[in-house]
């Protein structure tokens, strides 16, 4: 992913930014609310429709009606009188197809220019926050939180560009796209995406506030590191390397996974990581051990020591949930301006994912309730030779080469990739080994650059053709360890998708993929081949079986986490005045409820709150459901590319661009997103392996 972090050294700054964001613009907000009222009446709209209908062929009636209504919903008093609204619509409606295509081409070209260059500015301003380097200073936060494009939409409206776009390119709901889209030409799809461009009018000051809030959340998580070498077990021993510093939750999770290969201390280390996670979720973690290696931390008794002497520990209390709540309040402010998608949940599912929430939840609950869960759990238990524990939700023993100790893998990767430049130089080879021709591999990777990341790593695609995508990855002083390499291969998959769908899709308005689940699916395809790219490919006739089991267990893990995320957002909407403490209690209660319903019978740990550990909940509002959707899509794509050239198949699929997900899937694999292929393959795998 993209994404995507704690910044204790500037807590005072963060607080002041939030206070300023909430207090300074009060008068502006009041004035904006007054001027943001819709005042164009149905009578005005009907006048436009009647006037245009008399002079324009009937075939355009739908566009006339939809366009006049859409402009009316966006027109404000500062844009002109009701009579000026009517005159604008009548004068600027484009009826003939040739002129409409010319208008589209000009809009598309110029929107790419805006998107591309504003993106480059944003990327450069955030470098001090996201790239490895000197300590972050208050001025870095100020620039990093600045949204350079915040006033662009205002300018689009004041210049009337937004109105001419909304007038001539109608907005289609998800239901309408689903019903009509199968028969649309590529140009008609591009026109429909142009119609998505102006459907809400958000004030610039609000966009700036949201940008600052999300930047602060990103900074909070980016520096939420745990110094593992300072952890003490019940006997007072240290089991982790002295220099091991892991980001929450990604690094902790991956360390837990890696210890399945450690037959000596692996289980005890896993239980220690698990305890760290629990203390983060319930906020009993001492403030002093977050991003600070000064203190030894007795996990079981929650005591800290400096130079052998106990020091008073101060729990983090509810900071984690204060940040989470800040995201909710920021995103909720968009609700009044989003007529088509009136809540963040609507925007996340119908608007961004373009799969209805009820359909997503049904996919998740159907898999979580499947009889396959207990059967796969029993199979894992037989392999481990012990009863399963809650942290076995991250069991990764199905992966090819999973028995190779991580120390050996890290020795290979640190030697191969001592710095970001070494990884960047190796990208063409990696892509060629995955099936691309040398020429195409060089073409794609020439548009990808590698940066040393401050956080766990992410992929940041370009926004205009022939600009570079950025692969951000964590590289230590001694080179890239295996955890960093594994994440980097995942992010490389994102970058390849970003580059192909920007540069090889026929219309800029169709660039990208239907939603982030699809880029996650491509990233998973790459990530699971990370050992192949190290030359460790082992031909195993059971590989396909283990692939199915691995995907099933990964889906089982992240679907529950996603349900927690969804239910927490539903709870926040039902309790908008909640305090951070109340939110913490709600998150833990919801996490326990989901756990008891779907996990406790197979993993134990009744009333377990582990599902609340994911940093995405704090950092990326409602992003988590994209991961399990990505797993399902990934599995269906994996089956499609089996015994075929992976590069050719990926190119074929990706060049469909950003049509809606279910139509994309039909074009890619011949059926919609479904759990059935995964369940069938899982059953086949168990029958073969038991």
Where are these regions (language model features)?
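Positively charged n-region of N-terminal signal peptides that target proteins for export
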Residues: 1-5
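Bacterial N-terminal signal peptides
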Residues: 8-16
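Boundary at the C-terminal end of the N-terminal hydrophobic targeting segment
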Residues: 19-23
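C-terminal, non-catalytic "cap/extension" segments appended to globular domains
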Residues: 28-303, 333-403, 577-690
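Auxiliary, metal-adjacent structural segments of Zn-dependent hydrolase domains
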Residues: 406-467
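Active-site recognition of the HExxH zinc-binding catalytic motif
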Residues: 471-502, 524
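Post-HExxH zinc-binding segment in Zn-dependent metallohydrolases
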Residues: 500-504, 508-551, 630, 670
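Long, amphipathic alpha-helical stalk/connector segments used for oligomerization, subunit docking
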Residues: 532-615
């Amino acid at each position: 992913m993209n994404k995507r972090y704690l910044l204790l050294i500037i807590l005072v700054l963060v607080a002041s930014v939030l206070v300023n964001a909430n207090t300074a613009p009060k008068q502006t907000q009041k004035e904006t609310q007054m001027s943001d009222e819709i005042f164009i009446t149905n009578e005005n709209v009907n006048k436009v429709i009647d006037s245009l209908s008399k002079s324009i062929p009937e075939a355009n009636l739908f566009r006339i009606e939809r366009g006049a209504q859409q402009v009316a919903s966006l027109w404000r008093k500062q844009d002109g009188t009701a009579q000026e609204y009517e005159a604008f619509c009548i004068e600027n409606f484009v009826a003939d197809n040739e002129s409409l295509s010319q208008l589209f081409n000009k809009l598309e070209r110029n929107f790419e220019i805006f998107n591309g260059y504003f993106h480059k500015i944003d990327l450069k301003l955030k470098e001090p926050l996201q790239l490895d380097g000197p300590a972050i200073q208050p001025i870095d936060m100020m620039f990093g939180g600045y949204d350079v494009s915040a006033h662009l939409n205002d300018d689009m409206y004041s210049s009337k560009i937004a109105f001419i776009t909304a007038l001539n390119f109608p907005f289609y709901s998800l239901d309408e796209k689903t019903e009509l889209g199968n028969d649309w030409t590529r140009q008609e799809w591009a026109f429909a995406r142009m119609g998505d461009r102006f459907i809400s009018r958000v004030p610039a000051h609000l966009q700036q506030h949201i940008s600052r809030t999300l930047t602060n959340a990103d900074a909070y998580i980016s520096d939420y590191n745990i110094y593992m070498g300072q952890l003490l077990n019940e006997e007072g021993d240290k089991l982790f390397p002295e220099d091991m510093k892991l980001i929450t939750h990604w690094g902790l999770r991956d360390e837990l996974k890696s210890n399945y290969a450690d037959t000596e201390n692996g289980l005890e280390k896993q239980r220690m990581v698990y305890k760290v996670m629990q203390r983060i979720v319930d906020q009993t973690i001492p403030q002093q051990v977050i991003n600070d290696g000064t203190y030894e931390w007795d996990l079981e008794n929650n005591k800290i020591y400096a130079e052998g002497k106990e020091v008073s520990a101060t729990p983090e209390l509810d900071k984690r949930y204060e940040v989470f709540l800040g995201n909710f309040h920021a995103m909720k402010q968009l609700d009044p301006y989003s007529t088509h998608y009136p809540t963040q949940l609507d925007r996340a599912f119908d608007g961004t994912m373009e799969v209805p929430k009820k359909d997503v939840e049904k996919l998740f609950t159907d898999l979580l309730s499947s009889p396959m869960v207990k059967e796969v759990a029993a199979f894992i238990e037989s392999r481990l030779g012990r009863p399963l524990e809650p942290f076995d939700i991250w069991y990764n023993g199905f992966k090819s080469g999973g028995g190779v100790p991580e120390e050996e893998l890290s020795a290979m990767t640190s030697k191969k990739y001592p710095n970001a430049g070494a990884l960047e130089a190796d990208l063409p080879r990696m892509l060629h080994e995955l099936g691309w021709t040398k020429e195409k591999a060089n073409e794609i990777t020439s548009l990808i650059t590698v940066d040393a990341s401050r956080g766990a790593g992410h992929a940041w695609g370009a926004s205009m053709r022939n600009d570079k995508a950025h692969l951000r990855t964590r590289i230590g002083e001694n080179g890239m360890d295996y955890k960093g390499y594994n994440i980097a291969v995942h992010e490389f998959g994102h970058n390849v998708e970003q580059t192909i769908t920007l540069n090889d899709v026929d219309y800029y308005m169709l660039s990208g993929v239907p939603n982030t689940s699809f880029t996650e699916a491509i990233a998973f395809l790459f990530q699971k081949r990370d050992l192949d790219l190290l030359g460790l490919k082992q031909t195993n006739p059971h590989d396909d079986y283990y692939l199915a089991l691995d995907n099933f267990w990964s889906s089982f893990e992240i679907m529950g986490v996603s349900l927690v995320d969804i239910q927490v957002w539903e709870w926040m909407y039902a309790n908008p005045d909640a305090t951070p403490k109340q939110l913490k209690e709600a998150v833990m209660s919801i996490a326990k409820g989901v756990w008891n319903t779907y996990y406790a019978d197979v993993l134990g740990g009744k009333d377990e709150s582990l599902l609340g550990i994911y940093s995405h909940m704090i950092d990326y509002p409602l992003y988590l459901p994209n991961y399990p959707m990505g797993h399902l899509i990934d599995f269906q794509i994996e089956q499609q590319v089996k015994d075929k050239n992976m590069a050719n198949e990926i190119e074929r699929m990706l060049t469909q661009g950003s049509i809606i997900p279910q139509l994309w899937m039909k074009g890619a694999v011949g059926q919609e997103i479904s759990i059935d292929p995964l369940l069938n393959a899982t059953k086949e795998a168990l029958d073969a392996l038991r």
